[in-house]
Amino acid sequence: MQAKTHILFSLICVLFYIDYYNVQNPIIFTILVLFTTLAVDIDESNSKLGKHFKPFSSIIQWILGHRGLLHSLLIPLLFYIILSFLNQQEIAIAIALGYISHIVMDILTPQGVYIFYPFKLKINGPIKVGSWLEKLLAILLLIAIAVKLLFVL
C-alpha cells in the first residue's frame, strides 16, 4: 500500500480507539500512530520514510529484505512488552496500533505479509499497490474519517 493509504487507515483506527478509550494526549498519540505506520516501511529504501533515511533504510533492506521481520507481529509485540514493562502503556498501544494497522493494509496486497515471520505463512489479498482499487479504498477511508469526525464534533 502507498503511504497515504496507510495513513488514512491508521487515522480511522485512531479515531475509533480514542472514541472508546481514555487517551491522555490524543494529539501525541495520533502523531505516534501515524509515524509508526510509516516507519514499518523503513525496510524499503524507496518508501516515504525510507527515502529520508536512505543509507539506513538501504542497509535494513539489504539485511532483512522488504516485508520480512519488520512486517511481522513479532516487532509490535516486542515494543508493546518492553514499553508496558517501562510503564508506558499509552505509547505501547500507539506504536502497536500504528504497526498493526500497517501490517493489515499490506496483507491486502498480492505481495502479502509473513505475519508470523520467520515461519513462511504468507497472508495476502487482491489489491495491487497504486491500483484503482487502492485509490477506491483510500477514498472510502477518507469518507469514513469524515463521517466519524462528524459524529465526534
How does the language model describe each region?
Residues M1-L153:
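N-terminal membrane-targeting hydrophobic helices
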